[in-house]
Amino acid sequence: MSTAARRRLMRDFKRMQTDPPAGVSASPIPDNVMTWNAVIIGPADTPFEDGTFRLVMQFEEQYPNKPPQVKFISQMFHPNVYANGELCLDILQNRWSPTYDVAAVLTSIQSLLNDPNTGSPANVEASNLYKDNRREYIKRVRETVERSWED
């Protein structure tokens, strides 16, 4: 069954294959273009550097008019990531635009890693450490990076 959402996701997949953004990858799971596995590599020169963070993206038939649900599978310590892996990111909520594609979503998440929004924390402990004790925050992030290699 071909729907607008499925056609759009196939275009997104083709773009990810032919023009992948640096440090991110994603593809649909076998036999279901509506669920994708993704990986974000921690950006260089940040506490997340060298991390390999796995995510799952779930799309509904309303895509691209409705954003995907995106969740980290890898354990994360970040002000905008809930304990269950869900993200607090404006473009996945009230600032979504149908012009965003999978690549744009993943690069936005990659950018968020080193530029958290502490005004809207999902993880209050991480947010407080980021603001008040950067050394301890970096230590905790580096522990997360090391765990990401084992995932």
From Swiss-Prot:
It comes from the Eukaryota. Coiled coil: none annotated. One of its GO terms (cellular component) is cytoplasm. Pathway: Protein modification; protein ubiquitination. It catalyses: S-ubiquitinyl-[E1 ubiquitin-activating enzyme]-L-cysteine + [E2 ubiquitin-conjugating enzyme]-L-cysteine = [E1 ubiquitin-activating enzyme]-L-cysteine + S-ubiquitinyl-[E2 ubiquitin-conjugating enzyme]-L-cysteine. One of its GO terms (molecular function) is ATP binding. Residues 4-150 form the UBC core domain. GO terms for biological process: chromatin organization; DNA repair; protein ubiquitination; sporulation resulting in formation of a cellular spore. The keyword Nucleus applies. Signal peptide: none annotated. Keywords: ATP-binding, Chromatin regulator, Cytoplasm, DNA damage, DNA repair, Nucleotide-binding, Nucleus, Sporulation, Transcription, Transcription regulation, Transferase, Ubl conjugation pathway. PROSITE patterns: UBC_1 (PS00183), UBC_2 (PS50127). CDD domains: UBCc_UBE2A_2B (cd23790). Its EC number is 2.3.2.23. The keyword Protease does not apply. It is found in: Cytoplasm; Nucleus. Its main location: cytoplasm. The active site is at C88 (glycyl thioester intermediate). Catalyzes the covalent attachment of ubiquitin to other proteins. Plays a role in transcription regulation by catalyzing the monoubiquitination of histone H2B to form H2BK123ub1. H2BK123ub1 gives a specific tag for epigenetic transcriptional activation and is also a prerequisite for H3K4me and H3K79me formation. Also involved in postreplication repair of UV-damaged DNA, in N-end rule-dependent protein degradation and in sporulation. Belongs to the ubiquitin-conjugating enzyme family. This is Ubiquitin-conjugating enzyme E2 2. It comes from Trichoderma harzianum.
